[in-house]
């Protein structure tokens, strides 16, 4: 029987097999291969003796929290308190894209925007949608449900963006602790510790917003350009880094307004970090 590990406590793994839950222990062979089960693992189990017989090949995995086979990252992005930072947003998009995880942007606190600010946000949303990155707001639970359908999902985003609040909306039984923004620091506080997948409609969602996607130092500099999907253009040189090369189509598109200038500026900034 096959299923997905949704919880691990000590050496006991809870496996979801089509809605039926089995508490299983990994066979001893895993200890000799340095393979430890992770939440999100697709596994084969012996449902009679309650053993995990095999762990399927992982398509990706995260360290904190330890989750494998993540399909999508819901990037909760505050537009007020803390202020919208396209640099942080693009950094998180690059990070999850590099890990073969689909980025989905969820803007929060849009009710705090002025009319003019809402118009500017619409332009930003229109651009990200155009390059294939889906966007929503934390007030549209119906749309969020559709975007996450059938996927293993983690939440990420800057602290204070409302990740725990959104998780509590998706699953009120979680009753996750949320901290208000620190007035002095202008940022939120981390309040969650562990990871477990809970069922939401047809999706499995990590119950912790603790995944940090702000460190991109593990991405090789020459591969950063691949995490900016709209940079996939026919430049004169195949190995064009879109920095100082001549006849670079990416720079031409930026100058023509076809690529958002903040995206290109952030790319150059990340390469220099």
Regions found by a protein language model. Give the residues of each.
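Beta-strand/loop nucleic-acid-binding surfaces
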Residues: 21-37
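Short, glycine-rich nucleotide/cofactor-binding loops
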Residues: 76-86
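Glycine-centered short loops/turns at secondary-structure junctions
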Residues: 100-101, 132
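Helix-rich effector regions associated with P-loop NTPase G domains
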Residues: 11, 34-49, 56-73, 78, ...
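SH3/SH3-like beta-barrel fold
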Residues: 13-17, 24, 45, 52
């Amino acid at each position: 029987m096959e299923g997905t590990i949704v919880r691990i406590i000590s050496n006991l793994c809870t496996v979801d097999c089509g809605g039926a839950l089995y508490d299983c222990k990994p066979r001893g062979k895993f200890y000799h291969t340095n393979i430890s089960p992770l939440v999100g693992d697709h596994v084969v189990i012996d449902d009679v003796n309650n053993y995990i017989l095999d762990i399927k090949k992982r398509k990706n995995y995260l360290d904190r929290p330890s989750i494998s086979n993540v399909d999508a990252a819901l990037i909760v992005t505050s537009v007020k308190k803390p202020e919208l930072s396209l640099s942080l947003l693009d950094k998180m998009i690059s990070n999850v894209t590099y890990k073969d995880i689909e980025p989905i942007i969820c803007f929060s606190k849009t009710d705090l925007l002025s009319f003019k600010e809402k118009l500017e946000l619409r332009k930003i949303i229109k651009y990200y949608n155009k390059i294939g990155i889906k966007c929503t707001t934390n007030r549209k639970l119906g749309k969020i449900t559709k975007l996450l359908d059938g996927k293993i999902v983690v939440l990420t985003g800057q602290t204070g963006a409302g990740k725990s609040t959104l998780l509590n909306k998706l699953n009120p039984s979680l009753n996750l602790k949320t901290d208000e923004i620190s007035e002095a620091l202008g940022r939120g506080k981390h309040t969650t510790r562990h990871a477990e997948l809970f069922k939401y409609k047809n999706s499995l969602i990590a119950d912790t917003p603790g995944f940090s996607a702000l460190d991109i130092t593990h991405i090789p500099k020459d591969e950063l350009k691949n995490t900016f999907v709209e940079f996939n253009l026919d430049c004169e040189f195949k190995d064009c880094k879109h920095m100082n090369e001549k006849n670079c189509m990416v720079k031409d598109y930026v100058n023509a307004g076809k690529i958002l200038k903040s995206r290109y500026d952030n790319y150059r900034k990340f390469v220099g970090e």
